[in-house]
């Protein structure tokens, strides 16, 4: 075994199975590339990204953990988003939520 090596069973691996995924188009209106990580609260991404932010509240990219999506200047791409799971509390990022996503 190599340090850090991951050995997986044969067959397909399904990420975020049975999650309520949505897709939407996102455009980078800025003049610099923007990279968004797998677990970043998508509603709080860089303001140069243009999309329906309200629809993304409490969601993250539907990609493998530790990976990211890069938006080049002027690029529009379709992304899939899934809801945060677990306690559904968001802290940090741009500070827009700082607590529970779901109101009791």
Curated annotation (Swiss-Prot):
One of its GO terms (biological process) is urea catabolic process. Pathway: Nitrogen metabolism; urea degradation; CO(2) and NH(3) from urea (urease route): step 1/1. Keywords: Cytoplasm, Hydrolase. SUPFAM superfamilies: Urease, beta-subunit. InterPro entries: Urease_beta-like (IPR002019), Urease_betasu_sf (IPR036461), Urease_subunit (IPR050069). CDD domains: Urease_beta. It is found in: Cytoplasm. Its EC number is 3.5.1.5. GO terms for molecular function: urease activity. It comes from the Bacteria. One of its GO terms (cellular component) is urease complex. Gene3D superfamilies: Urease, beta subunit. Pfam families: Urease_beta. It catalyses: urea + 2 H2O + H(+) = hydrogencarbonate + 2 NH4(+). Heterotrimer of UreA (gamma), UreB (beta) and UreC (alpha) subunits. Three heterotrimers associate to form the active enzyme. HAMAP family: Urease_beta (MF_01954). Belongs to the urease beta subunit family. This is Urease subunit beta. The gene is ureB.
